[in-house]
A protein has these predicted regions:
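Gly/Ser/Thr-rich loops at beta-strand to alpha-helix junctions
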Residues: 107-109
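Glycine-rich, flexible loop motifs
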Residues: 1-96, 112-240
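Hydrophobic residues embedded in beta-strands of well-ordered beta-sheets
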Residues: 98-100
Length: 240
């Protein structure tokens, strides 16, 4: 009976699946301060990896949201929420009465939006490079082969070789790479803030209605960019 009541209260407080909150319930000032703190820490610890910003404030976040194609309402009203897929909330107790609450959730589609934005950037950038290289090949063929009947065959062969070149794979470099890493720092901080809000709500329910206090909290992530490894994208894994 206690578990059923706890589950009902949590379900009423934290949206799941595609659902988000009917209204914005977070403190934007607290949110922006948290994102800024996380961002500036990465700037300090790993100089040159991401774009230096004086401050991450509400104006900065609004521009970020608009750029990647998310509405302000959905961005803020998704905090806190669980999402779908393999995300879950779980509470269990040991035989001696100790309780453990687990929240497994993420950035609520923000990571996918950021990824898609920069994939489009990569494709656009690499397409421009490929076109420039191809035009150079065409000019070299025409200049080096007097037999015009061979031009089409030679150009097609050269085009195929270009397609097989490794550098024609979609990738980010320079300013675009820093832009992607910068956005991912914000996305990871967003996901962490979502966890904080969920734990805050659940902790309040446990304390107020069941007289249970939270003694320790552990936070870990398994989909993230590890800047300590130059950097490394860890998908479904943590650092050993």
């Amino acid at each position: 009976e206690r578990y059923a009541e706890f589950e009902r209260m949590v379900g009423e407080s934290i949206p799941t699946g595609f659902h988000i909150n009917d209204r914005e319930i977070i403190d934007r000032q607290e949110f922006c301060a948290f994102i800024n703190e996380q961002y500036q820490q990465v700037c300090k610890d790993f100089p040159g990896m991401i774009n230096p910003e004086t401050i991450i404030d509400d104006k900065f976040i609004s521009a970020f949201i608009k750029r990647i194609g998310i509405t302000v309402e959905s961005f803020y009203r998704a905090l806190p929420s669980l999402g779908g897929g393999n995300h879950f909330l779980e509470y269990g107790e040991t035989e001696d009465g100790r309780g453990f609450f687990t929240a497994h959730c993420g950035s609520r589609n923000l990571g996918v939006r950021v990824c898609n934005y920069w994939v489009r950037k990569a494709k656009s950038s690499c397409s421009a490079i490929a076109e420039e290289d191809f035009q150079n090949v065409v000019e070299k063929v025409k200049a080096g082969c007097p037999d015009r009947t061979q031009w089409q065959r030679m150009i097609l062969e050269a085009k195929q070789r270009l397609r097989e070149e490794e550098y024609l794979s979609d990738y980010l470099g320079g300013a675009n790479l820093r832009g992607y890493l910068s956005d991912m720092v914000i996305t990871q901080a967003y996901a962490r803030f979502n966890h904080i809000m969920i734990h805050r709500l659940v902790g309040g329910i446990l304390q107020e209605h069941f007289g249970i206090g939270i003694e320790n909290e552990i936070f870990t992530t398994h989909n993230y960019i590890d800047f300590r490894d130059n950097p490394m994208i860890r998908k479904g894994a943590i650092r050993a």
